[in-house]
Each structure stands twice: as structure tokens, then as C-alpha cells.
Amino acid sequence: MDKQGDILMKFYDLHCDTISAIYELRKQGKQAELSKNSLHLDLEKLQRGGYGLQTFALFVDKGEAEDCCLEAKSMVQLFKEELKKNQDVISQVFTFGDIEENERRGKLSALLSLEEGSIFEKSPEDLKWFYDQGARIATFTWNHENSLGY
């Protein structure tokens, strides 16, 4: 920011666990929203901080989840619902052109990523499904061995 408080450069952050954290809180019966919450990141904080793009990782702990793919698909649904509720502020991006369009409109960009290959290790069709939902980044492993790596 300059002396007048104007943002000179937009930030593009390539990882946060906010959607996964909101998902877990809701599983515990607690209220949590993307717009404003007590987590590390919410839309209000992104706007104040001068963000242009936030990558939202869907994290599933293979050591705890019964079905990693199903769990991640539920998180995709949550991600889409939260974006719809806040569509005046943030939109999902699939291409660089989408990022440019959001910037022209004064909106934040949301990029979807997958953290843990066990989400899609069972079937190439699952990986295709997540791609169709907008996932553009994926990690093959986290802390557990899976069929993709160790």
C-alpha cells in the first residue's frame, strides 16, 4: 500500500485450507462461512489485504477419511455454495482469462486445488470429474503413502 492506502500490487496465494476447515467445523455442528470467520482467511481479510487470487485446497487426511474421494466431492459442493453466496465479491476461475475478467470486474478469483492424491487415485474418471469442477492444481501425496507415491 502507498501512503494513501491504495493497493499497489495484488497478491496471488497458491494455498489455503479454509474450505477444508469450514467443512470440518460444519461436520462438528459449528457455524463457519467463507465471507467472515475466525480462521486464517476469509473474504473480508482477502479484500483488505489486496488479494487478486486465492487458491483453495481441498485437503482430505487419508489416515482419517473412510472415502477420500467422496469427502473431497462434498468439499467441492461446499466450495461452490460459498462462492455462489458471495458471487458479488469472488468468482471461480478455470483459465487465466477468467482471472483477467475478475480483475476487470473488481472481483477476487478463486482457484480450486486438491491436496492428497488419494482423492483421485482409484479412478481416472474421478480426476476428470475434479478437473471439470475447476481443480487445476493437485498434489500426489501428503503424509501418507498412496498408489501414486510415497
How should these model regions be labeled?
Residues 4-150:
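N-terminal hydrophobic targeting/anchoring segments and the immediately downstream early-domain regions
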